[in-house]
Amino acid sequence: MLDVSVIIVNYNTKELTYNCLKSVFEMTKNIRFEVIVSDNGSTDGSIEMIKKDFPSVILIENNSNLGFGSANNRGLDVAKGKYIFYLNSDTILLNNAIKIFYDYWESSSDKDCIGALGGILLNEYGNTIHSGGNLPSYDDILRYQKAIYFVHRRNSLLKKLHMNWFYQLCSNFRAKNDIENVQEGEIGYITGADLFLLNNENARFDENYFLYYEETDLEFKLFEKNLKRLLINGPKIVHLTRKNNKGFNITSFSTIHCQISSIIYTSKNLKKDTSELMEVIKSDWELPYVNEIIEKIDKDKLISLLNVANKVC
């Protein structure tokens, strides 16, 4: 058996994926590992690049964009490692991070109590950034969706708003969940950018989520099983946050699926009445600026997805 299976989801992030793969192969030593890339129907030359420059990579060519969790699961289906390391395509390893995770778990005196490991992530300037947070409560989720509605309402006359500014503006609403002063130790959830787990059913994502909340949902299950989610010092990993979202409008595909996923998470894990949350999201979608974009995506389909999400449990 191999020690670790590294699973990377790629969707039209050719340059980022190249740099990520390059760092994995250059930095990973003294461990038996494989790299699996699950591609979600990329059209930017990613597949050709991987075949040419990284022939040892196990490449899964999905016919369409399956979403983050489903694509990772396709990698999990063929993984042969004792451990799984989910790694975002917009990350770069600066040291032998995979071996550090492996050694930490293997040498732990209470390894049977560990559910997942993650590192303290760095930005491109070497500063620590969001690496995890508290498992969100219903109030946290509702607060965040109200923040989105507030921004959209204020933005209806501006026509354009980009991801970076949105995240800055909403940071106060997320403060209860995002942990700024990241330290080694137990945490509610580890970001899905670098998630190290045993290769078993605990590593499988719920495919009801297309985008966002997948890792939070997975780690909520670990929480229910009294398995620890730990951030550890040692691994040095750069996360180029939102580099692959450059220029996205916040009412685009990703934000809408974040809203839908918030309903799934609330209904499934928190067992809460989602009526108020549904109303906030639907009110957001009725704003002229938002509605204009949603109509282009397929409003009827999105409303249907939202209603189905409310029934997931």
Regions found by a protein language model. Give the residues of each.
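Short aromatic/hydrophobic "clamp" motif used to bind/position activated sugar donors
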Residues: I84
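A conserved acidic beta->alpha catalytic loop
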Residues: S23, D39-E48, S64, L94
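A recurrent flexible, glycine/aromatic-enriched loop bordering the glycosyltransferase active site
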Residues: H152-Q168, N172-L197, K246
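A short, conserved alpha-helix in the catalytic core of glycosyltransferases
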Residues: I179-K236
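Glycine-rich, basic loop-to-helix element that forms the pyrophosphate-binding segment
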Residues: E61-A79
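Conserved donor NDP-sugar-binding/catalytic core segment of glycosyltransferases
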Residues: N96-N134
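Active-site-adjacent helix/loop segment of glycosyltransferases
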Residues: I7, L122, T216-N307
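Short, acidic, metal-binding catalytic loop of nucleotide-sugar glycosyltransferases
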Residues: K22-R32
